[in-house]
Amino acid sequence: MNSPALQDCVRDWGELQENYQDIQETHRLYKQKLEELAKLQTRCSGTIARQKKKLKELSVELKKYKSSVKNVEEEEEQISVLNNQIRIREKTFFEMESFLPKKNGLYLSLVLGNVNVTLLSKQSKFAYKDEYEKFKLYLTMILMVLSFICRFVLNSRVTDAVFNFLLVWYYCTLTIRESILINNGSRIKGWWVLNHYISTFLSGVMLTWPDGLMYQMFRNQFLSFSMYQSFVQFLQYYYQSGCLYRLRALGERHNMDLTVEGFQSWMWRGLTFLLPFLFFGQFWQLYNAITLFKLARHPECKEWQVIMCGLPFLVHFLGNFFTTLRVVHQKFQKQN
């Protein structure tokens, strides 16, 4: 006769078998739904692509008709209505496509291959965006503290290398995460994307710059600038995140909009006090570029890193300054 303990084990196994049957059935249904989902995604993507092509052709035809024929007022109004409806339809397709798999861009393809990075629910998209914002905040604070230590406590090329390596890793990670967010509907584009690629290059060159007279002549200026930049980025995150939250609640901003290291039109209400901080930082970038160009002409300058750091600082200044200036100019034009 079996012992009570063995009988309990047999009974438990029987219960596990029943649960196992349920698990198998659930998993079968799950795989079936996945196959159905893949078919729906393919069909939806194809239909949207065809519609977008037709809309593009229609826009071209309307433009040609408007420019070639002297239209009566009624026709002009009809063309305006059609163009407006086309723009609305394009925005709707943009929203739809953010939930559909898409081919990765060149950068993501090089880094991740052909892995699908599209998140399929609003919750997962927002969670990833929120995690990205927290990552920026925490790393900005760490970089601010580390730049302070390197500037005022430890004068060592080793700690400087650690700081520069952290900058390279930080900006590389930002570019990857931003590319994933763009694939999922975030509308960060233009200069604010390119800005981080340039920062990655600049940090990499700073990391390879050997210790010497030229490095020591620029070191304190660079670390002081890094401290100030981290401080301004912290201010921007703190105030932009609050502003974005209010605008999302009012339905004036998209859920996937991100904080940026600059000034955009939506920041005009409540965030104009940041402009002096931004302009000061941008002219500091110009000052860094001028300093490096002067060092490049120094008789003892032999390092290629000097000129290769000066150029990115100059590009940073031009991009940041004129992008900010354009936003301010457009806002004043609208008000007038």
From Swiss-Prot:
Localisation per UniProt entry: Cell membrane; Nucleus inner membrane; Endoplasmic reticulum
Membrane topology (UniProt): Multi-pass membrane protein
GO molecular function: coenzyme A binding; monoatomic ion channel activity
Annotated residues for binding of CoA: K129, S186, R187, Q236, Y239, Q240, K331
Origin: domain of life: Eukaryota
Ranges of the Extracellular topological domain: 152-157, 209-217, 294-303
Gene Ontology cellular component annotations, sorted alphabetically: endoplasmic reticulum; nuclear inner membrane; plasma membrane
Keywords attached to this entry: Cell membrane, Endoplasmic reticulum, Membrane, Nucleus, Transmembrane, Transmembrane helix
UniProt free text on domains: The transmembrane domain (TMD) has structural homology to the very long chain fatty acid elongase 7, ELOVL7, despite low sequence homology between them.
Family: Belongs to the TMEM120 family.
Function of the protein: Multifunctional protein involved in mechanosensation, and plays an essential role in lipid metabolism. May function as a potential ion channel involved in sensing mechanical stimuli. TMEM120A is structurally similar to a lipid-modifying enzyme, ELOVL7, and contains a bound coenzyme A molecule, which suggests it might function as an enzyme in lipid metabolism.
Protein's UniProt name: Transmembrane protein 120A
Species for this entry: Xenopus tropicalis
Lineage summary: Eukaryota, Metazoa, Chordata, Craniata, Vertebrata
